[in-house]
Amino acid sequence: MKKLLFFVFLSFFTLSSAQVRNEIHIPDIMGYKTLKCDFHMHTVFSDGLVWPTVRVSEAYAEGLDAIAITDHIEYRPHKSDMPGASHNRSFELAEASAKASGILLIRGSEITRAMAPGHSNALFLSDCNALDVPAWQ
């Protein structure tokens, strides 16, 4: 009896911890596929508080189809905890999780300059490290 109760208890907690996806239903426009996306996310490699794979899990749970992790180039408050970390690292860590979850992952970064061009996101990059320059001119 104890084994049966243990099995039922274990099954309940195992099944209840499975990630549930909140499906968002937005109709497609004829000839196009509608995607639910978030193109501005931060991780611990910037001023976020979670690991890149957690952002992918959140996106899946929220019903998103595509995300861009756009960690800051200039502002990295956790830099001393991850010395030498590449600006591409968050994408690299999230890539396998995104693929397994069916989430389209876009490589990007956030550029924050004191003067024009100011504050913007760069998406579809091949190398985020190329943006890490002292002057934008």
Labelled PLM ranges:
Residues 1-2, 20:
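Short, intrinsically disordered low-complexity segments
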